[in-house]
Amino acid sequence: MNFSTYFENLSVPNNISGNITFPISEDCALPLPMIFTLALAYGAVIILGLSGNLALIIIILKQKEMRNVTNILIVNLSFSDLLATIMCLPFTLIYTLMDHWIFGEVMCKLNEYIQCVSVTVSIFSLVLIAIERHQLIINPRGWRPNNRHACFGITVIWGFAMACSTPLMMYSVLTDEPFKNISLDSYIGKYVCLEDFPEDKFRLSYTTLLFILQYLGPLCFIFVCYTKIFLRLKRRNNMMDKIRDNKYRSSETKRINIMLLSIVVGFALCWLPFFIFNLVFDWNHEAVATCNHNLLFLICHLTAMISTCVNPIFYGFLNKNFQRDLQFFFNFCDFRSREDDYETIAMSTMHTDVSKTSLKQASPIA
């Protein structure tokens, strides 16, 4: 994924991210009110992303009865979002507004790398959640993942994410090449962080591959899983309505799946503008007006980073006990286990047998 900030009115050697331009004209500078608005928006996302995901992680890990497959994957998703909040937002905002990199060569390589790892882990955490829901509802008598499987899956997706992101670490460089032919004193000793791929074709292939691996492919798979789930639940509810009143159980099942699907939809909508922006700009630099590039980039990037807040927001709105524990969290109170009345979001303990039109329950899900 291409997270580099591209600038205007200054040619770059062909071997550095392919004829990228840099802004040296004051006419292209963002107005102060716009900078203030962007900084305020980024700050709000950082605060919400940090506090929300940190609270969600602590609350789930603190409660033993919440340590099931779905919640383990939710914690992994929140940790990935937390990492993105720390590594993506502040560095990208400062870099884009300053038009040069001030954080050194190590952070230049790590910033690109960690951002790519984070989004890969996030989407594949959603894939694993979809698989768990699919097996639970579509094939309840077959194989179902347990906590050990969830931990193994998390290890695999982190390894896969790191492998996919390695080219960004390899080819991210700190260079002053773009500023060497500029006579302005303000650009002396300034550096930019760019992706220096060996060939333009390699960069385009890699960017397109990441779009498929990080966005299109996983979302298509998730869509198929949840479509099958909702069709099965609809048929099951129709059967149960004819036999007995099971409105409470049906509403709980519906609420849980709506929450999980909302997280997926939120992720997809937030990241779509950013992926489109990168693809369009990578394949045709002239498609984006030079003076509008930085503003469009920041808006698309900010929209993508809002996804780091989606997880705790949807989890909180649709889980009453999370709201209650969240109040304890911000009041620095101790969390105490409530085994009798604690609501868990996962249905991993529920066993269903649709063929006999019965519902057997090993332990409460709510």
Curated annotation (Swiss-Prot):
Extracellular side: 1-39, 104-111, 171-203, 282-294
CDD domains: 7tmA_NPY1R
Superkingdom of origin organism: Eukaryota
Topology of this chain in the membrane: Multi-pass membrane protein
Transmembrane segments: 40-60, 83-103, 112-132, 150-170, 204-224, 261-281, 295-315
Glycosylation sites noted in the Swiss-Prot or TrEMBL record: N2, N9, N15, N181
Keyword Glycoprotein: yes
Cytoplasmic side: 61-82, 133-149, 225-260, 316-366
One cellular component term from this protein's GO annotations in UniProt: plasma membrane
Pfam families on file: 7tm_1
Keywords: Cell membrane, Disulfide bond, G-protein coupled receptor, Glycoprotein, Lipoprotein, Membrane, Palmitate, Phosphoprotein, Receptor, Transducer, Transmembrane, Transmembrane helix
Keyword Transmembrane helix attributed: yes
Subcellular location: Cell membrane
Disulfide bonds: C108-C193
Name of the protein in question: Neuropeptide Y receptor type 1
UniProt source species: Xenopus laevis
